[in-house]
Structures are given as structure tokens and as C-alpha cells.
């Protein structure tokens, strides 16, 4: 398994020629990280990191439902992604497709897993691409730096939810 040089607190690995594995610990309970991951108004607070503003965050959280995020980057261009949910286990696991609308032929399947120990959450994202070329293009896009920023923002949003959602919140 190859490791990428990570600049933030998420660890990025390349387990196979078609996969990207991202692991990040959060100082927040998993139901809070999950809530921030699936809630459109919260997604708008973290998904773009420091790179722009999320103008669209749509989530139809059900198997067969869709999601779509659009960000207007600081340099003025628009970046959009969408996908379809394939599996949902509230507070535990989400499997969905992911399509960058700039290259719609490069669909990936993301498996997002939330685990908790001692009040801390480990988020694991396995991105499965159809071929090595798509995986390599994903890496070359600069995704790692933006993802690191987004994960930092996600942690802040999840921590901010502690007083609002102190129970076990589902989907």
C-alpha cells in the first residue's frame, strides 16, 4: 500500500492502482460527524474548506437517492459533484457513487465509514475508481490539499454540534 505525502491530519493511502483510502480522526462523537456529513446546511459550512463557497448542497439520503454539491471557488470558477446512494447505515456507513461533473466518465464509488472510540471518531473514506487513470487524475487534481482543509472544517462543525445534538442522532 503506497502512502502519499499528507500535509494535514488526514492520512491518504493508495491501497491498489484504483483506490484512494483517506483516514481522519475527529475530536467529536460519530453521530455528530455523521450529522455534519449528511445535513445540507452543515455541508455548506465545511465541504469547500478554505477554497470557496458551497452554493448547492442537496442530499436525498435514501438508497437510490442522490446528492449534489456545487462550490464557487475563490478564483471564480464552479466545481460540482454528484452521486447516488447505494447503501446507508445511519451513523455507521454510507456507500455512494461520486461523479465530478467536469469529467462525468470518471465515476467512483465511495465507501464512508464512521467508527468511534472514547468519544473520538475515525472517518474512513475508500474511493474506488474504475481504472488507474481515473484514480491518478483524481490525485493530480489537487484533491488532497482541499480535502485536508475540508476535514479540518468538518471537525469544527461536528464539535460545534455537541451542545445542539447530544443524543444519538440518526439519518
Feature annotation, model-predicted:
Residues 1-52, 171:
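Hydrophobic ligand-binding cavity/cleft-lining segments
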Residues 1-6, 129-171:
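A conserved amphipathic terminal alpha-helix motif
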Residues 17-23, 54, 66, 80, ...:
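Intrinsic-disorder/low-complexity, polar/charged segments enriched in Ser/Thr/Lys/Arg/Asp/Glu/Gln
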Residues 21-22, 41-78, 167-170:
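Short beta-edge strand/loop motif at the mouth of beta-sheet-based domains
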Amino acid at each position: 500500500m503506497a502512502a502519499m505525502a499528507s500535509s494535514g491530519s488526514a492520512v491518504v493511502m493508495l491501497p491498489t492502482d484504483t483506490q484512494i483510502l483517506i483516514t481522519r480522526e475527529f475530536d467529536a462523537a460519530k453521530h455528530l460527524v455523521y450529522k455534519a456529513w449528511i445535513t445540507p446546511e452543515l455541508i455548506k459550512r465545511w465541504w469547500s474548506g478554505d477554497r470557496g463557497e458551497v452554493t448547492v448542497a442537496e442530499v436525498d439520503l435514501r438508497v437510490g437517492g442522490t446528492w449534489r454539491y456545487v462550490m464557487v471557488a475563490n478564483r471564480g470558477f464552479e466545481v460540482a459533484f454528484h452521486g447516488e446512494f447505494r447503501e446507508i447505515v445511519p451513523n455507521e456507513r454510507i456507500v455512494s457513487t461520486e461523479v465530478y461533473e467536469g469529467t462525468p466518465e470518471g465515476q467512483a464509488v465511495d465507501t464512508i465509514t464512521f467508527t468511534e472510540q472514547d468519544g473520538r471518531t475515525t472517518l474512513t473514506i475508500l474511493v474506488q475508481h474504475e481504472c488507474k487513470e481515473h484514480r491518478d487524475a483524481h490525485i493530480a487534481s489537487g484533491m488532497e490539499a482541499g480535502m485536508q482543509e475540508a476535514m479540518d472544517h468538518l471537525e469544527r462543525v461536528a464539535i460545534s454540534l455537541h451542545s445542539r445534538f447530544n443524543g444519538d442522532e440518526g439519518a
